């Protein structure tokens, strides 16, 4: 399967800290991604259903609904079931990694994020 160019890929960025969200959005857009944003898990689920992203970058610790619960709900949606979801978090603990895997995340990365490396990870998940 040919690898898609990042310029036509839709990314849902789920991050509750506005400064971090802005920084990541700008970095991703510089890489050519089309970025949609959500500041909590509830908005993330609604946005995923509406926009059908190619990949989701999900913080774990979020208001209203955490990233674990949001991911489980997204995985229940037939059209979104196979969308790669990457946990993007400051948590380095093994418990968070295991919980993320059990919740349906495809990958787990810790902040700070190298956006070039993240682009390669996304490409690998979409093959």
Q: What is the meaning of each model-derived region?
A:
Residues 15:
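Conserved acidic carboxylate
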Residues 22-30:
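Charged docking surfaces used in two-component/phosphorelay signaling
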Residues 32-39, 47:
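Short hydrophobic/Thr-rich beta-strand motif most characteristic of the beta2 strand and flanking loop
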Residues 63, 81, 93, 112:
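The feature encodes the CheY-like receiver
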């Amino acid at each position: 399967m040919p690898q898609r160019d990042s310029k036509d890929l839709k990314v849902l960025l789920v991050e509750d800290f506005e400064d971090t969200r802005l920084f990541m959005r700008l970095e991703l857009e510089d890489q050519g991604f089309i970025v949609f944003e959500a500041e909590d898990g509830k908005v993330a689920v609604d946005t995923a259903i509406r926009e059908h992203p190619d990949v989701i970058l999900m913080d774990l610790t979020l208001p209203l609904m955490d990233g674990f619960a949001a991911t489980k709900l997204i995985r229940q949606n037939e059209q979104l079931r196979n969308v790669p979801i990457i946990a993007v978090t400051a948590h380095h603990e093994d418990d968070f990694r295991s919980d993320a895997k059990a919740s349906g995340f495809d990958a787990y990365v810790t902040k700070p994020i190298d956006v070039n490396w993240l682009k390669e990870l996304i490409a690998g998940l979409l093959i």
